[in-house]
Amino acid sequence: MIIDITEIMDLIPHRYPFLLVDRVLEIDLNKSILGIKNVTVNEPQFTGHFPTRPVMPGVLMVEAMAQIAAILVAKSLGSTKNKDVFLMAIENAKFRRIVQPGDTMHIHAVIDQQRTNVWKFSSTVTVEGEMAAESKFTAMIKDKS
């Protein structure tokens, strides 16, 4: 099931310049998801990171992993319109390859555990089949107040 940017924006609240998933390529509800982010030099982080050698910040790769997981949660639950998804913990984040403008990040997340409103994930970012980043993280789903 392909999910385009319009539906992604219906599923998660992020917007430019902080929307870091362009398309979902595969989704297996309650299990895993694969999406992409096309990295372009026009993104605001590259004006300062770094002006003469643009490099995608590691924290934004982690954020992209969290966003793809939030899309998986929203689709698995049927909707998160009346809920907020909060990142609770990031574990073992590792960065293994530079990501730069022109690259396409393939962002994969797997649900490791889900208990009531707490979800645990393993996630990776690859570029051209090469591991760029990996992390485990925990998120909480709460009713909007």
Curated annotation (Swiss-Prot):
Species assigned in the record: Rickettsia akari (strain Hartford)
Record keywords, A-Z: Cytoplasm, Lipid A biosynthesis, Lipid biosynthesis, Lipid metabolism, Lyase
Molecular function terms from GO: (3R)-hydroxyacyl-[acyl-carrier-protein] dehydratase activity
Family the entry assigns: Belongs to the thioester dehydratase family. FabZ subfamily.
Task of the protein: Involved in unsaturated fatty acids biosynthesis. Catalyzes the dehydration of short chain beta-hydroxyacyl-ACPs and long chain saturated and unsaturated beta-hydroxyacyl-ACPs.
GO cellular component: cytoplasm; membrane
Biological process annotations from GO: fatty acid biosynthetic process; lipid A biosynthetic process
Name this protein carries in UniProt: 3-hydroxyacyl-[acyl-carrier-protein] dehydratase FabZ
Compartments reported by the entry: Cytoplasm
Pfam families: FabA
Catalytic reaction(s) noted: a (3R)-hydroxyacyl-[ACP] = a (2E)-enoyl-[ACP] + H2O
InterPro entries (UniProt xref): FabA_FabZ (IPR013114), FabZ (IPR010084), HotDog_dom_sf (IPR029069)
Keyword Transcription regulation on entry: no
Lipid biosynthesis is among the record's keywords: yes
Catalytic EC class: lyase
Organism ancestry: Bacteria, Pseudomonadati, Pseudomonadota, Alphaproteobacteria, Rickettsiales
Database matches in SUPFAM superfamilies: Thioesterase/thiol ester dehydrase-isomerase
EC number: 4.2.1.59
